[in-house]
Amino acid sequence: LAQALPTLTNATFNPTHQAEGQSVAVRLEFDKALQAASAELGGSALALTKTADAKVWTGDVVVPVSSELTVGLVVKDYQDLSGNTGAEDSSHSMPITPTITIGTFSDVSGNTTVTINGTTTRFEAGETIALKAVDTDSLVVLGSATVLVDGTWTVDLDLSTLKDGVITVYANGANSLFATADEVNTTFNYSSTTALVVPSYWERYSAELPSQKAA
């Protein structure tokens, strides 16, 4: 009688998403005990090791550079104890961690609104970047920006309720694959009023005025 070929029943990643150039642990579960197995993530080979349960194999791999939202896992050349080889499986993939950047901008003076912009990778058009501005008294202003087709975003934040001084802006978000970008932040100096500049001629004029003495 022909024996059933082994099959891959599950594949998991730890962490569930990872950045390019960082290591991820992969756990493969099969329906039968195996004597051999191999796998690749985005073309990079995993060094698989059989666990105490020969149905479970694990390995680490560095996430390769890719422009895609995910990187594909290919499991192949896996043999059961009778030498039967299972079919190549490419049904699993891991999201690559998206990224957010905040652009550079100047200190804000004499204005209560600041325009903040930035870029993203692995966010699709219409997805949302969450922002918050925090002053030195921990007062918070929240905002959100919509990612455009080219991956950029822009938002105007109203700072009128915040205290003058150093403001820290934070940006974060998750894409459609529930992969969360690392939060980024930047700081700037905020002054809601414009400094009054006294003309030099007024200084000369006032100095020439006779001082009034109390009677």
Task: Enumerate the language-model features and the residues they cover.
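Non-catalytic beta-sheet/beta-sandwich ligand-binding modules that flank or precede catalytic cores
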Residues: 1-115, 124-127, 135-183, 193-202, ...
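Short, flexible micro-motifs
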Residues: 121
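Beta-strand-rich recognition domains
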Residues: 187-190
